[in-house]
Regions:
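Conserved beta-loop-beta element that borders a ligand/cofactor-binding pocket
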Residues: 98-122
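NAD(P)H-binding glycine-rich loop region in Rossmannoid oxidoreductase-like domains
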Residues: 1-45, 49, 71
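Glycine/proline-rich active-site loop of Rossmann-fold NAD(P)-dependent oxidoreductases
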Residues: 118-131, 165-176, 198-200
Length: 289
């Protein structure tokens, strides 16, 4: 979209009621300092440009795919997450852009999405990063991991949430935390290990944040050596992963999202991620443009 002129985008928008923004990058894509410039370029600047074009041609509503880290930031102001994590700050700025775009004839809705499982044909799942982390502990009789948990949903459910938000007749701005399932990390990892062919009985040992922070020292040094500014503070991540970052699914059900097989979706994601990690398949990675 960044390669198209305003006039070309207007032609694409004409005759439509809703604009859906499902583009951009998340915290797992690496950028040099200052990382905020890249989050603005890929996640936020397109909205500042396209919203006025939407209004010009009569589009009435926009649905933007955001992050549940914005939901966490608002839920836990005591943690100072915006100050420590550029990605969180960028997602909050994205919601402000959406909020400020609202008028009597234009509404906006941000779907604050958690971890998503399932596969898209030809696209590399983000979970190859998890495979890399776990491989380092494969020779141990147990896996060390934080004690918290996360909200989640499947690819199919994301599509249903988008469709529900698109036809939702609600004026103004709203940010909806979206999830259908909540799962502790230890239960999640047992599904992961079974998907990797290592059986369902892998021992998972929960660790305190301070222990994980020790492991982050090397990662922080690696970032510095390579000139990378992480979107998430490596020394704040253990505190975040120690939380039960759960979401009540009542909001998601209001969008018309139906039940799905989350364990099968996790299994599919991990199997494709493992195949990608092993070099058995070539897939398209996440990128800004």
């Amino acid at each position: 979209i960044n390669k198209k002129s305003d006039e070309e985008i207007e032609e694409m928008l004409k005759g439509n009621d809703v604009f859906i923004y499902a583009a951009g990058v998340d915290e797992r894509v690496e950028f040099p300092h200052p990382v905020m410039d890249y989050y603005d370029k890929f996640n936020n600047a397109p909205l500042r440009r396209i919203f006025p074009l939407c209004k010009k041609v009569g589009v009435k509503r926009a649905v933007v795919l955001g992050s549940y880290f914005a939901y966490l930031t608002k839920s836990r102001p005591d943690m100072g997450l915006q100050q420590r994590n550029p990605y969180f700050k960028a997602r909050m700025m994205q919601e402000d852009i959406c909020k400020n775009a609202v008028d009597d004839n234009f509404s906006t809705c941000v779907l604050e999405l958690p971890y998503i499982f399932g596969t898209q044909p030809g696209r590399k799942p983000v979970w190859t990063i998890l495979i890399e982390q776990l491989k380092m502990m494969d020779n141990l009789p147990f896996t060390l991991y934080p004690k918290g948990g996360t909200a989640m949903l499947t690819c199919r459910q994301v599509g249903q949430a988008i469709a529900g938000a698109a036809v939702r007749e609600k004026a103004g701005f709203e940010a909806i935390p979206v999830a259908m399932y909540n799962m502790k990390w230890d239960k999640f990892l047992k599904i992961v290990y079974e998907a990797r062919g290592m059986g369902p009985n892998r021992k998972i040992v929960g660790v305190q944040p301070w222990m994980m922070k020790l492991g982050m020292i090397g990662i922080a040094k690696d970032y510095k050596k390579r000139g990378i500014e992480s979107g998430m503070d490596p020394f704040n991540l253990p505190d975040i992963m120690n939380l039960d970052l759960f979401i009540n699914n009542q909001y998601t059900k209001e969008l018309g999202v139906q039940e799905d097989d989350i364990e099968a979706a996790i299994t599919d994601s991990i199997r494709v991620s493992q195949a990608s990690y092993d070099g058995k398949v070539k897939l398209l990675e996440m990128k800004g443009e």
